[in-house]
């Protein structure tokens, strides 16, 4: 079955990851190695009538694990439900290596949280994701997701469809109130934030040094 295959894949990763850690320990490199474990997406496994990955932005697909270990440097046993993006890994490593982070990078270093210098309860006010084959339609629907600590907005661009969930009252994401009366203020505010985030991520190119 699909779930049995999924469990088998988890065991395979667990076994091979264990081999890697054991090698680092056997070669006396574990204490001087930063280990980062994550993945690019989750699996539906039947949730919302879907299997495998892709086409939607439910929590089971976009909420992925992120485990960071560095014995003696990263605070042990620390857990956080703060909003984090995988793009935060790069500035985290840059801070560890004492490399200045350019202003144009969107990621935020997790190092202050990992070392206990900052509370683990909050990191970013929102996170964003994009998918370029949403809804599995032949015309390749573009879609974006914006999620803050309470709400999740999904916009399927060009076809007038969307989703809006209150994750505090509806953590399973079953009640889409995109079209409900009274949702306009929340929806419009989040659409604006998502549009701003999209534009702020555009590469500005080299600085102009001559007259226009």
Regions from the language model: what does each represent?
Residues 22-78, 85:
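Histidine-centered active-site microenvironments of extracellular/periplasmic hydrolases
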Residues 1-4, 70-73, 171-174:
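Short glycine/proline-rich turn/loop motifs
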Residues 41-47, 87-90, 95-167, 172, ...:
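C-terminal cap/loop subdomain of S1 sulfatases and analogous C-terminal strand-loop tails that border
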Residues 3-12, 56-64, 74-91, 97-109, ...:
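A short beta-strand-to-alpha-helix junction
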């Amino acid at each position: 079955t699909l779930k049995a295959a999924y469990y088998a894949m988890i065991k395979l990763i667990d076994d091979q990851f264990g081999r890697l850690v054991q090698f680092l320990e056997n070669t006396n490199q574990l204490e001087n190695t930063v280990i980062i474990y994550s993945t690019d997406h989750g699996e539906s496994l039947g949730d919302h009538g879907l299997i495998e990955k892709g086409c939607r932005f439910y929590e089971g697909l976009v909420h992925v694990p992120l485990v960071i270990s560095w014995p003696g440097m990263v605070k042990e046993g620390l857990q956080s439900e703060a909003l984090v993006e995988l793009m935060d890994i790069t500035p985290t490593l840059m801070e560890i290596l004492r490399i200045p982070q350019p202003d144009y990078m969107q990621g935020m270093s997790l190092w202050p949280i990992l070392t206990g210098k900052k509370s683990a309860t909050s990191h970013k006010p929102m996170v964003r994701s994009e998918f370029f084959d949403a809804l599995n339609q032949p015309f390749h629907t573009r879609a974006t997701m914006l999620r803050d600590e309470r709400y999740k907005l999904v916009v399927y661009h060009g076809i007038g469809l969307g989703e809006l969930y209150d994750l505090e009252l509806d953590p399973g994401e079953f009640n889409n109130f995109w079209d409900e009366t009274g949702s306009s203020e929340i929806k419009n505010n989040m659409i604006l934030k998502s549009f701003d985030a999209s534009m702020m991520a555009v590469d500005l190119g080299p600085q102009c040094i001559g007259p226009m």
